[in-house]
Structures are given as C-alpha cells and as structure tokens.
Amino acid sequence: MFTKRREAVASLLGPDACLLVASNNHVSRNIHHTYSFRQDSYFWYLSGFNESDSIVLIKTDKTGSLSSYLFVPPKDEHSELWDGYRAGPQGAQNDYGFDHGFNNFDADKTIPGLLAGANKVFSLIGYKEDFSQRVSSWVKEARLKDRHTAAIEHLDAGPLLSSLRRVKSDSEIEIMRKGCEISAQAHKSAMQFVAPDMNEQSLEAYYLYKFAEHGSRFPAYTPIVA
C-alpha cells in the first residue's frame, strides 16, 4: 500500500524532481519523559513508519522512474532497551520497502547530493519551520554542487499530497468505518457511565479506555470533557 502511494506521488512529481517529508519528533514533557508520540499524517501516508526523527525522500530521474529513501534513527541497544525497537537503515529497506535506508545523522551530508540535478524540490513549506529551514539549506547546497540545479524550483508539496489523500482506497474507507464505530461506541459508553458527582477526569479516563479496549491507540480527536 505504501509503495503504491509513493509510486502515485512520483507520477505527479514528474521527471527530475524530489519530495521531502519529515516525521514528527518526540516532545519533552520533562527532563526524562516525552509526551505520547503520534506520527505525522503526511509522513505516515508515504512510509507506514512510526518512528520519530525520520525523513522520506522520493526522487524521480529523467524518465520519471522512482527511487525512495528513508532516513531513520540509528540502531542503538541502550535506547532500544528503554524506548523500544528501532528498524534502522536495513529495516527501512527490508521491512518498509524503501530502496535506500540511511541513519538520520547522515541527512545533512547526503541529501544535498541527492537533490543535485533536480529541476524541482517539493516539501511542506512552512508546515514545520525547523524542517523547512533545513530543506532550504539543502537546496542551496545542491545548487552549489551542480550548475544545472541553479534554477531549481522549491515548491509546496501540500496541494499535491492532499489531492492524493482525499481519494480513499477501499482499505482506508474500512479503517475509517471502524474508527467511526469505535468512536460511537465510546461516546455511548461514556453517556451510560456518567453519574451525579462524577468529576470530568474520571469520565475522560473511562472514555479513552473505551477506545483502547476496542483496538484504537488514540481517539481521532482530543476530547473536550466538560
């Protein structure tokens, strides 16, 4: 499914083009803990990869043929002991179907070379300011590497990706239906559970529990319990 999505994106990019999309990153809650991680929807759409600090790069050559790259957190026994399994660059290829996998710390030295020679570079301009600045710096460096890249266009990928995401496959529609069923049941259960003198925190905890009970890690939207 994700490979087909990358192929669909490549067909819209045209020849000699690149697309860059970043994952979400962990957000610190305090010095030793982070908030629950939820992957960026655009990044997930193209990769199915649920780790932070990662980058998808899709590149087309002069014929429009696709090459896919995934920059991921490196394998680290100590970190994996505490935070869970990491796929690593090899897993990006073997488990997620990317043509090439790299450690994320190689992005700054690798990506400008991949962009060199492209006519167009697409990214979600202004969506994540820090990443947008990194992409701009990579484009500038790519221009210095290849005189043919001097006229490179840096374009917003939002309209392109949104046009694909609006059209749902049968499997996506089924997931949405399942999500609606879980949401409806959670609301019904919360209404049956509520009682006089119950505080909002208890009701919210029960409501979120019902999502987890039926197989959903998160609700579709953060609930307002008042």
Predicted feature residues:
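Active-site cores enriched in adjacent His and Asp/Glu residues with nearby glycine-rich loops
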Residues: P15-I31, R177-A226
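A composition/biophysics-driven feature that prefers long, compositionally simple stretches
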Residues: M1-A186
